[in-house]
Amino acid sequence: MSRPASRPVSRPASRPASRIVHVNGEYVPEDEAKVSVFDRGFLMADAVYEVTSVLGGRLIDFPGHAARLARSLAELDMESPVTEAELLAIHRELVRLNGIDEGLVYLQISRGNPGDRDFAFPDPAAVRGTVVLFTQSKPGLADNPAAKAGIRVISIPDIRWGRRDIKTVQLLYPSMGKMMAKRAGADDAWFTEKGGVVTEGTSNNAWIVTGGRIVTRQLSDDILHGITRAAVLRLAREAQMAVEERPFTVAEAKAADEAFITSASAFVLPVVEIDGAPVGAGRPGPVATRLREIYLEESRRAAI
């Protein structure tokens, strides 16, 4: 089920510069964008999303994000109202309309507006999903000072639902985790299971470097299948770095030589402190620093 994306538009010359967003096939100023109060994304968090970075006005890892979007939709038995080619065209048009050099494109697809509140899924033949995209300008995205200073994380219990591999908009607990970190004077939080086993960060995958090996948790329903994670794994192996996919604990992370996170918006960021304890020398290590360099080099080369 698809429909063509609306024809590219130019900014109206008569109005002040305003961010242009995309809603269900239309490009509109953000203050004119509308989604029904009965939309299931709003009422039920019945929606999935993706965030794609933009460097030099081009999209980073778009095919991976599109593939994960398709998987998330399939896992929730949700049909996409747009094709991958249409989504690519919309991403590019929003980048153009909003003059994004470095930043993000946010995409969300919900199960749509059935006309009233109801727990039961609507008939997809009768109710089309809602498609929303917008950009965020982030000058200096690739030059994040945290890459040189490192970030501090705390560990918190992981009480989320069991399908963390589906990228849904159910982000209340991750948001709470970020606020817990902020109140503790840290930058982010790592979720932990019984025994202090790390699952992932609030919006990123978690890694350590120990015994000469790069370690990150293996894919399962327990963690998000990070697109940047996959790219960093591939690039590390291509660089002849030893990689191991397995669980690790907070205690092991504190005793590691290095720790870091990966995500579409952070790329690779070193973790220099966990629960107040320094990791390694307490400053960004050579492995995380090199992986960030390699990832950014490859991303710029392959961007579309």
Say what each PLM segment does.
Residues 1-190, 194-197, 220, 224, ...:
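Conserved alpha/beta cores of soluble small-molecule-handling proteins
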Residues 189-191, 205-208:
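Short beta-strand scaffold segments in enzyme catalytic cores
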Residues 198-204:
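Short beta-strand/strand-turn micro-motif
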Residues 212-214:
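Active-site beta-strand-loop-beta-strand hairpin of nuclease catalytic cores
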Residues 228-229:
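Secondary-structure junction motif
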